Curated annotation (Swiss-Prot):
InterPro entries: YcgL-like_sf, YcgL_dom. It comes from Actinobacillus pleuropneumoniae serotype 3 (strain JL03). PANTHER family: PROTEIN YCGL (PTHR38109:SF1). Transmembrane segments: none annotated. Residues 4-88 form the YcgL domain. This is YcgL domain-containing protein APJL_0712.
Length: 95
């Protein structure tokens, strides 16, 4: 199995938003509007998409395919948890 390393960057503007690119510090394939929205990328790590470890919120195969076709993958933050809904679901039978 071949190695497909990618560089992972976090956004300083939005917590939980990550940008994956094929090579460290190469953002030519990332549209200018996205770069402006993302902010100055903060390097997190290099990651082997073909390795045994899986990404937590994205599938390795999807990230690799996006990088190969469009040159980058943008991972959006998870939706905020609805605390009221969670509370009500947990306390349904206690009234």
């Amino acid at each position: 199995m071949s190695t497909h390393l990618c560089a992972i960057y976090k956004s300083p503007k939005r917590e939980g938003m990550f940008l994956y690119v094929a090579k460290r510090d190469q953002f030519d394939s990332v549209p200018e509007a996205l770069r402006q929205m993302f902010g100055k990328p903060q390097f997190v790590m290099l990651f082997n998409l073909n390795g045994e470890k899986q990404l937590k919120r994205s599938k390795n195969e999807e990230v690799l395919q996006a990088i190969q076709t469009q040159g980058f993958f943008l991972q959006m933050p998870p939706p905020p948890e609805n605390l009221l809904k969670t509370f009500l679901e947990q306390n349904r039978g206690e009234a």
